[in-house]
Amino acid sequence: MIIKKNIKRAEFIKRPNRFQAYVKVDNEEIMVHVPNTGRCKEILIPGTTVVLREESNPTRKTKYDLIGGYKNGKFINIDSQIPNKVVEEALKLGNIKKLKKYNIIKREKTYGNSRFDFKLGNDSGEEYYLEVKGVTLEDGGVTKFPDAPTERGTKHILELIDVKNKGIGAGVLFLIQMKDVKYFTPNIEMDKNFSEALVSAHKAGVDIFAYECDVDEDFITLKKEVKVIL
C-alpha cells in the first residue's frame, strides 16, 4: 500500500509517554503523535532519524504521526494501524498462500465473546478467524513479539485455540514491519505467558504465520513468509 499523505524526516529527541514524542524538524522542536503503544526503544533513540506522516485533522493536537525510524540503516515502520491494512490487501490479492481459498473477507468480526481482526469465508461455507500482530522488534535479523507485556495479546491467542477446538479455522499472522529478516520467534523474555500460549496454539492446530514486508518511508506491502521458531 502507498502512503499518500506527506512524509517528512525528523530527528528523534524524546518520548515522554506512550502516545507522544518530541522531534526536531526544520530546526524546530515539535510534539508528534506515536501510533504505537509498544516500547520501540530500540528504534526511538535520541538522535535517530525518524519519519513523520502529516495529518490533516484540524481537531488534532499534533500535526504529524511518527510512523517509523531507522535502525542500523534499515527502515522499520512502527504504525500499529498499518498491519491490518497490509494484510487485508494481501488477502484480497491472494498473496497468503494457505488462505487463498477464502474469497470473503470481513474486518473486525466477533465469535462468541471474542473479536478478531478478520473473518474469512468461501462459497463452500468454510470459515476462518485470523488475528494480526505487528512486529517491530528486531535483533540481528531475529524478530520477536511482543516488545512489551500483552495480556490482550495472550487472550487473543487463547481465544483462537477455542475457535480451533470447535472445528473452525483459526490463525495468527505476525506482520514484520521491515524487510530482510532471518526468522520470527515469540519474545519469551518479555512475556512468558504469551509465548507459552503461542506454543499451545500451535499444538492445537492454530496456524502461526509470519511475513516480512517490502517497506520504505512511503509504502509497505506484504512480501514473503518467514520461518517461525517456537
From Swiss-Prot:
GO molecular function: DNA binding
Transmembrane regions: none
CDD domains to which the protein is assigned, alphabetical: SfsA-like_bacterial (cd22359)
Record's signal peptide: none
Pfam family, one: SfsA
Cross-referenced Gene3D superfamilies: 2.40.50.580, 3.40.1350.60
Protein family: Belongs to the SfsA family.
Name of the protein in its database record: Sugar fermentation stimulation protein homolog
Organism of provenance: Clostridium tetani (strain Massachusetts / E88)
Record gene name: sfsA
